[in-house]
């Protein structure tokens, strides 16, 4: 019999083993769609970003007008920019849901896959941050100033570090040029880490909603999950296109329509919505270094999750108390997101502090406690 090129060709063989003949659990739900959705978001961002970079000028006197020029004079430039800006929002929606799925179903017990995922999240956050600075509007400039300034809280080397990052004594032209370079570079770093992420995942195979071995019941990825992924894709692209075409500025800040001015501070400096939860935690601590540490901890705490798993069951499918706690954590994060968008005044300060405290308490103390309690309940 003639050899099947799909299974013998060195390159096609890799694609076949990853996307076609990949043995997949037969019972994974729509929560397992977000990996492929993230891949699609990523490719969309790379393509639109490349097209935008062709028309962008990384200079403080030209950046703002070059973005305006792209939207006004380049064929479909407005669409490319709107897809890129809102595509970032959908990227974060997908990654947060992907992480939430991992938390709920105990996927974090694949430690290498989980840890590379956390590194991916951090790299994505860095990419989004430097990208937001590029249009050089008011919020771009002041966001860059506030966030880079946080590094000055690091003892002894802080101030030197900040001036080194800025390329001067304030956010200026050198900062913008290096941020553009970083915004171009980091997506390729993300692509590399993604391949590592998938390599680790394919070592163990996918988890499933029951959290038990699915070796006895595997089905090929194609056509079953390829068609399921296409459904997920249409369900994501529809709202993305709707947003980009009908209300492209809904998630942006009106302040960014004003060119950057170092002499005028906006009344409320706040990041894009997907960073608000971390921003709220940062603002909840009245000490600069403490705030920076809490900000870092809010994301890095994910690295501790595998070590805080005390339950005998992997997933939360049959653990109602853990489920309740999980959804309380989700509500808590939504409250933090809302508080982060509000001015620093009563009652938002105290709400933010309570929500920050309950965020860390839930993850570090309550989840392990409830897991242990549920283990005891299994014996009765």
UniProtKB/Swiss-Prot annotation:
Q: Could you tell me which cysteines form disulfide bridges?
A: none
User: Which residues are heme b b566-binding?
Assistant: 98, 197
Q: Where in the cell is it found?
A: Mitochondrion inner membrane
Establish whether keyword Disulfide bond is in the entry.
Answer: no
Cofactor annotation comment: Binds 2 heme b groups non-covalently.
Topology versus the membrane: Multi-pass membrane protein
Question: SUPFAM superfamilies this protein is in?
Answer: a domain/subunit of cytochrome bc1 complex (Ubiquinol-cytochrome c reductase) (SSF81648), Transmembrane di-heme cytochromes (SSF81342)
List of residues binding a ubiquinone = 202
The UniProt keywords, alphabetically, are:
Electron transport, Heme, Iron, Membrane, Metal-binding, Mitochondrion, Mitochondrion inner membrane, Respiratory chain, Transmembrane, Transmembrane helix, Transport, Ubiquinone
Q: What GO terms fall under cellular component here?
A: mitochondrial inner membrane; respiratory chain complex III
MF terms from GO for this chain are:
metal ion binding; ubiquinol-cytochrome-c reductase activity
Task: Extract the signal peptide range.
Answer: none
Required cofactors, per record?
heme b
What Gene Ontology terms for biological process does this UniProt record contain?
Answer: mitochondrial electron transport, ubiquinol to cytochrome c
Q: Belongs to which family?
A: Belongs to the cytochrome b family.
- Subunit structure of this entry? The cytochrome bc1 complex contains 11 subunits: 3 respiratory subunits (MT-CYB, CYC1 and UQCRFS1), 2 core proteins (UQCRC1 and UQCRC2) and 6 low-molecular weight proteins (UQCRH/QCR6, UQCRB/QCR7, UQCRQ/QCR8, UQCR10/QCR9, UQCR11/QCR10 and a cleavage product of UQCRFS1). This cytochrome bc1 complex then forms a dimer.
The function of this protein is: Component of the ubiquinol-cytochrome c reductase complex (complex III or cytochrome b-c1 complex) that is part of the mitochondrial respiratory chain. The b-c1 complex mediates electron transfer from ubiquinol to cytochrome c. Contributes to the generation of a proton gradient across the mitochondrial membrane that is then used for ATP synthesis.
| Further details from the record | Heme 1 (or BL or b562) is low-potential and absorbs at about 562 nm, and heme 2 (or BH or b566) is high-potential and absorbs at about 566 nm.
Protein's name according to its UniProt entry = Cytochrome b
Question: Species name for this entry?
Answer: Numida meleagris
Identify the coding gene: MT-CYB
